[in-house]
Every structure is written in structure tokens, then in C-alpha cells.
Design a protein with these regions (language model features):
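Terminal connector regions
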Residues: 61-107
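Intrinsic-disorder/low-complexity, polar/charged segments enriched in Ser/Thr/Lys/Arg/Asp/Glu/Gln
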Residues: 2-6, 59-61
Length: 107
């Protein structure tokens, strides 16, 4: 997994959306449209405690970095709740996100 990658993110909501530095970006607000598979196991590459905010219709290119340590995600939006590197974890989370109306998960 590369150290960082860039993802283009669009806020399709009618309200502002903010994401903090610690958040598993794959599980960010369902109305943010971006390649969620590219965000798997990653967080924003910004200083701890910082936030990026999108106004309605706004687009930002963000840099993401991998989670370190044990790479287990619990909570957030409830799309993972287990090891990020487990066999089948990404396809299962993409299917759940699709079922819950998340953008950026493919057809």
C-alpha cells in the first residue's frame, strides 16, 4: 500500500460536511462522492485534530495515508467493524455501503 494517495471528493449534500483527521475516510458521509475503494484503510493526511470542510457542491482533492498499527476499524459508520486487511473485508464493506446509499461505491 503506498504511503499516500490523492482522492477527488465532491459534496453532493445541501449542507456543509466536515471530516476529521482520525476518521476512516472510506466511511465518511454517504453524500460525499469519491472513490471509496481508494480510501479503504486510510485517513486524511492532515495534522491530528484538524478538519476538512466541504460546502454544498464544493470539490477538494485530499491526500490520504494508511492507518498504522493493528489496522482494525470499529465504529465510525459501522461499515467495517473488524480488521481492515481481512479477506473479503473490502468487498463486504462496499456492498454494505451500496445498500446504505453511499456514493462512490460503483453500480
Amino acid at each position: 500500500m503506498p504511503d499516500t494517495n490523492a482522492v477527488v471528493v465532491v459534496n453532493t449534500a445541501a449542507v456543509p460536511i466536515a471530516v476529521t483527521s482520525h476518521w476512516h475516510f472510506f466511511e465518511a458521509n454517504r453524500q460525499l462522492d469519491f472513490d471509496r475503494a481508494a480510501a479503504w484503510g486510510r485517513r486524511l493526511a492532515i495534522p491530528t485534530g484538524s478538519t476538512i470542510r466541504w460546502e454544498p457542491g464544493e470539490t477538494h482533492t485530499v491526500t490520504l495515508r494508511p492507518f498504522a498499527g493493528r489496522r482494525i476499524a470499529y465504529g465510525f459508520a459501522g461499515l467495517v467493524n473488524g480488521p481492515l486487511d481481512a479477506d473479503g473485508a473490502l468487498p463486504a464493506a462496499l456492498a454494505l455501503a451500496r445498500d446504505r446509499g453511499y456514493l462512490g461505491v460503483g453500480a
